[in-house]
Amino acid sequence: LIVQDYIRAAREELDVSVGPGRGSAAGSAVAYCLGITQIDPIKYDLLFERFLNPDRISLPDIDVDFDDDGRGRVLNWVTQKYGADNVAHIITYGTMATKLAIKDVARVQKLPLSISNNLCKLIPDKLPEGPDGKVPKMNLNNAIAAIPELREAETSSDPLLRDTIRYAKMLEGNVRNTGVHACGFIICRDNISDWVPVSTAKDKETNEELHCTQYEGRVIEETGLIKMDFLGLKTLSIIKEALENIRMSLGIELNIDEISIEDPATYQLYCDGRTIGTFQFESTGMQKYLRELQPSTFEDLIAMNALYRPGPMQYIPSFIARKHGDEPITYDLPCMEKYLKDTYGITVYQEQVMLLSREIANFTRGESDALRKAMGKKLIEKLNHMYPKFIDGGKANGYDPKVLEKIWNDWRAFASYAFNKSHATCYSWVAYQTAYLKANYPSQYMAGVMSRSLADITTVAKLMDECKSMGISTLGPDINESYLKFSVNHSGDIRFGMGAIKGVGEGAVQQILAEREKNGPYKSVYDLVERVNLSTCNKKSIESLALAGAFDSFGTITREQFVTPGSNGETFLDALVRYGNLYQTDQAENTFSLFGATEAIETTQPEPPKNIERWSDLERLNKERDLIGIYISGHPLDSYRIIIEKVCNMHMDQLEDITPFANQDVMIGGIVTDLRIGQTKTGKPYGIVKMEDYSGAGELALFGDD
């Protein structure tokens, strides 16, 4: 009821988006009826005993996703409702890993940095297998046993080096610092300090002082307190952004929780593999499998979401072949069809193992969950204990012991890969919502995705390419069409947000938007400086807007005219801002005539410089990129596009993995953006060339005569 209360408050009072559920709580019909989750557990065979059963010792927890922006507001609401002394975040303890222990000790010992770095480079990410075939745990003792150079350092005649290794071994694994758990939160009926020791910690984002328990999460449960998880999910923010774009551009109030789960356009998008920008399904490999699978039901999407991960991925080709009838669907026992039909005879979910253990061997609900846990965590002793019960139960139901043994061994092999269906179903529904929006409201959705990706301009560039392939133009910022973030204009094209321009702060954009909303579009740059507060929207902001092309739609003054000095050495931009300040001062200090009428003193509008040298396309594009981080109105390679597409067999974004091009001659075309020249240790020259093409940027190393 506590969880239901803050979820209700999030939706009804705080305008915060809430996810449909996650984890085992989605198997609870009570949680569904209370509105905590939005996935019908009966319809999708989600099991309550994963959430709660008599054999479960620990208290169940309900993890809830909120949109990124709203999570903090929900936590504040909870704090106000229950009292600041009754709630607390959870502390985390950061321990010294192997490399960090060496570095910290080396710094105190004043061991030269080069030697410290060399020691750290000797530490592998993973130790080799031991004589028993097992991979030893990574720690300094095991690393020393496996690596001769570290053994030499441990017994070195240099006391500094020897002591560094000795003290690092002693300090490894000790607590080095504290932090705050990313999502864990405690709500207590009493003052929380009556139950556990409390400290304070600074919130890295808001700089607020937070109450924190001094016990870690795993210890908290032993005190009897319940941990609640408040998670921030970026995808919910994207969906919220898209819904706002739909409302603003089309006037439609769409309820995303009530969309059809059988929308043809959405399934066509999945069948075409056009999932860039959607949740969970956008990787290149997933796109390939979707095109092969041709999903036609929501169950297909749940299964693909569960299968596309290391381990079960090997079953995807068989899953696809069985769906299309290219491989026979077989069941070890006829009764297994009931629970494996939706996944074409392949065990995909942990819940299937639980249901089948009951069906075949009469396991109780609690026992089936214990089996799921034992298989997932490879608890050999527990499995050995449950094996006779499974065989005996199956024999009692008339099944062949050899077939039962095969089923058991198959489960043991696959159970560590099997996925939680409750979680896969919830997240597949969120993924479906994003695909629905992309299929039915493409401009509005892609604008939302780009707004939430501004910190990664490479991702924005890829999303712009995706928009182009969808027939959607991504236009540069415009003073009369742009908002703070990406938006959709009346033609259905996406406009860059003014907040994406370097040098234009959020305060300046809000000032521009508030004035535009109040008194209509700006008619010219003169009209702009006459109306906006020039303390907030200052010269730097106006310059950045001009050079980014936000005033191009006025058509009277070019970008270079703003910043090229005139005959008196002053730029038009300087004169324009001075004019705006004078105009606003005159308006404020208007004089009264004899009859009391208000008359503003006329201020002369400055003229932009004439006959100045126009910027080349490359110069204009480079300034655009400096301010926005990306080429918008064109690309320096546009004149060579046909040649590049005809001649080149490799793109810059493929440099990350050149395995497919082994033993091949490759041709790359692009623009050189940086060049570093140096000498190797042997005195030979080398160069590092940074190049960029339409796909992205990369570096090429050239040596000797290259």
Predicted features and spans:
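Alpha-helical scaffold/interaction cores of sigma-54-like transcription cofactors
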Residues: 1-575, 579-581, 585-587, 594-597, ...
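Prokaryote-biased recognition of long, low-complexity C-terminal linker/tail segments
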Residues: 210, 215-216, 461-465, 556-706
